Curated annotation (Swiss-Prot):
The chain crosses the membrane at residues 190-210, 214-234, 242-262, 293-313, 328-348. Its main location: membrane. The gene is mmpL6. It comes from Mycobacterium tuberculosis (strain CDC 1551 / Oshkosh). This is Probable transport protein MmpL6. It is found in: Cell membrane.
Amino acid sequence: MQGISVTGLVKRGWMVRSVFDTIDGIDQLGEQLASVTVTLDKLAAIQPQLVALLPDEIASQQINRELALANYATMSGIYAQTAALIENAAAMGQAFDAAKNDDSFYLPPEAFDNPDFQRGLKLFLSADGKAARMIISHEGDPATPEGISHIDAIKQAAHEAVKGTPMAGAGIYLAGTAATFKDIQDGATYDLLIAGIAALSLILLIMMIITRSLVAALVIVGTVALSLGASFGLSVLVWQHLLGIQLYWIVLALAVILLLAVGSDYNLLLISRFKEEIGAGLNTGIIRAMAGTGGVVTAAGLVFAATMSSFVFSDLRVLGQIGTTIGLGLLFDTLVVRAFMTPSIAVLLGRWFWWPQRVRPRPASRMLRPYGPRPVVRELLLREGNDDPRTQVATHR
């Protein structure tokens, strides 16, 4: 009972403490309300002054409203006038566009009486008034690859500018340094293409007539074209990549002419010797032909190459470039094409090298082959009315 009474007393103490805390909170709330009351008293004192200002503020806002309405009325009229002006301008623009008045301009008659104007008119307009001249200035040197490259862009821009105008079908021509060099370059390229195709076609025809073989003629032309490409590649490597000097445009044209002539000539000589020795068999005939004339053809090619290469010591750089290009082409043609490629192609093709001729891949039988020294045999074979060459050879022996 004593323990229960102590617990009850503790609980009652806590309850009393809670009541006192609540009373303290009410006191604090009262203090805060007192400060709010002070603020409200100050606001109540100011409120009559604010109320007194409201009529003036209302009057000011009414004035602003009237100004806004007046501004709106003014701008409405301006907007209507602007729309009318735009409509008129659009109609006038369409009319001017339909009339194409912008394609010309007006000059007063007095301008044509001016001596200075007449002098300039002769420079920029033709006598009949159907041609006009314009002066274009390059940013760089026109006599350079960069200046020449501007020609196509200028022509394209001029053609684009006259599209949709009465001058759409007019001819546009360019003159000057860059245009002249561009015409020379295009003409040289076109002429070189024609000359190369015509020369190769003519060489092919002549080789077919002489060798009587389509394949052999194609081999000659193909190896000559290969020598041309190799000579130009080696020349570009030496002059432009190693020495840093651009090749002149005429080097290509002159090198083509000489290399076509010399290359086809030497190849024809070698293949003609193949044909002369074909009676001994294809491979044996090639070996004999190379042994008999290979050294002569090689020596001739080396001498010609050395002669042309000596142009490099000339004071004229273009002669040095022409000589070295031809010399490099002859060296490649002599040491690679005629010494290795042409005999190798003939061996690989075999009897098809002489197509459409029919040749024996091996030597003829002893019963079908004449005997005796070569000059005597050739003389007897070419003699007309020869019935039995072997009997005639025996009499010569």
